Amino acid sequence: MKNLYSLRRFYHVETLFNGTLIVGGRDQESTGFAWWAGNARLINLSGKLLGAHVAHAGLIVFWAGAMNLFEVAHFVPEKPMYEQGLILLPHLATLGYGVGPGGEVIDTFPYFVSGVLHLISSAVLGFGGVYHSLIGPETLEESFPFFGYVWKDKNKMTTILGIHLVLLGLGALLLVLKARYLGGVYDTWAPGGGDVRVITNPTTSPAVIFGYILKSPFGGEGWIVSVDNMEDVIGGHLWIGLLCVFGGIWHILTKPFGWARRAFVWSGEAYLSYSLGAISVMGFIACCFVWFNNTVYPSEFYGPTGPEASQAQAFTFLVRDQRLGANVGSAQGPTGLGKYLMRSPTGEIIFGGETMRFWDTRAPWIEPLRGPNGLDLSKLKNDIQPWQERRSAEYMTHAPLGSLNSVGGVATEINAVNFVSPRSWLSTSHFVLGFFFFVAHLWHAGRARAAAAGFEKGIDRDTEPTLFMRPLD
């Protein structure tokens, strides 16, 4: 097939270390890309590109399985997951596997099974990747036309998009199936401190589900990150699953409209840029979810959120000083505001001190102590349960702090155990990777648009000093 880009521009980009190293269809002269450009050499070799993608999937699944078994091997049931640096077992626990009331791990065998299944799957994918990379046909169009494609074929591209959407939708519906019929999922809001619960009545109201989409991302609104009950979570997956399945079927059966054909760039690099942009957005959303949300990411497994840890400290000292005789309803702090309790801007009774900034935090261990107007003084005096005290004391000392500035009043101790919360790891990694993927999106989008417009801006390589230097070997 004729190349869709100019080879001339690439000839002077890179001098091969070994000019005699030639692999059919994968050398610099025939593809315009040097060895380090990776899959770019396979742009027009659909069979080999399939091998690269299957092998990549195998590597991903291998990591998941190996890391899963590593975490199982190192897991200590007596300590909370977030104290052990775990990031995979909390996800399995959130799905309701191996845990009971209060998030206590009662069986690690499901975690072992998960790891083994992923390892076996990775072996199958790895074999497929090696086969298609080395043995299988270089292009699929002739032998397997259903799996073959041409990047410019708009109808085929939207068919592939549709297949992907159907698979994503089925994945979302699998969670609905697990929550509704296959044992339930962990609900941190279950009475008494969380438990595995079958979600018998997921939210189906479009006003509620799409209301999250229409909310502001700022302040106390929080967009979709503000979801605070499992009914809405599972109902949202039901909606998104059905939309993806039916949207996928639509894209399989139809051809793109004229406005879509004109609006988009239809090339392999353009599709790469669209994908990178989408993954970037998902990375940023995941960052916010794991940092702020304690429903989808239960604190029993991931540790408390920052505001939750700050509120937990205020609660812990209120409990202590109340037992020592303090009148927590009227005691003044050093600023003249309430030391333990004060009023929010809208009149609710909230915790006093520096944690006042987090007055609208919601957490399962504190909600039972609220009344119609914020914290209930009578409940604080008479109804505090031991599990609430234990949990808040634990959360107070495991804040996801990694900042050099204010920490919401949480006491920091230079001699403390070196603790980094999984929330810190996961939110930071997803933010950083989301940013990198966004830059990659801009890079490939710019190249794709330039190529489509008939020009590619870049450094003039004809006078590159490197070209006149003696090769290192």
Swiss-Prot record:
GO terms assigned for molecular function: chlorophyll binding; electron transporter, transferring electrons within the cyclic electron transport pathway of photosynthesis activity; metal ion binding
Modified residues (N-acetylthreonine): T15
Free-text comment on the cofactor: Binds multiple chlorophylls and provides some of the ligands for the Ca-4Mn-5O cluster of the oxygen-evolving complex. It may also provide a ligand for a Cl- that is required for oxygen evolution. PSII binds additional chlorophylls, carotenoids and specific lipids.
Membrane topology (UniProt): Multi-pass membrane protein
Keywords: Acetylation, Chlorophyll, Chloroplast, Chromophore, Manganese, Membrane, Metal-binding, Phosphoprotein, Photosynthesis, Photosystem II, Plastid, Thylakoid, Transmembrane, Transmembrane helix
Domain of life: Eukaryota
Compartments it resides in: Plastid, Chloroplast thylakoid membrane
Propeptide residue span(s): 1-14
Transmembrane domains' residue ranges: 69-93, 134-155, 178-200, 255-275, 291-312, 447-471
GO biological process: photosynthetic electron transport in photosystem II
Principal location: plastid
Any Gene Ontology CC annotation: photosystem II
Binding site for [CaMn4O5] cluster: E367
Residue positions where Phosphothreonine is found in the record: T15
HAMAP family, A to Z: PSII_PsbC_CP43 (MF_01496)
Assembly with partners or alone: PSII is composed of 1 copy each of membrane proteins PsbA, PsbB, PsbC, PsbD, PsbE, PsbF, PsbH, PsbI, PsbJ, PsbK, PsbL, PsbM, PsbT, PsbX, PsbY, PsbZ, Psb30/Ycf12, at least 3 peripheral proteins of the oxygen-evolving complex and a large number of cofactors. It forms dimeric complexes.
Family: Belongs to the PsbB/PsbC family. PsbC subfamily.
Role: One of the components of the core complex of photosystem II (PSII). It binds chlorophyll and helps catalyze the primary light-induced photochemical processes of PSII. PSII is a light-driven water:plastoquinone oxidoreductase, using light energy to abstract electrons from H(2)O, generating O(2) and a proton gradient subsequently used for ATP formation.
Protein name according to UniProt: Photosystem II CP43 reaction center protein
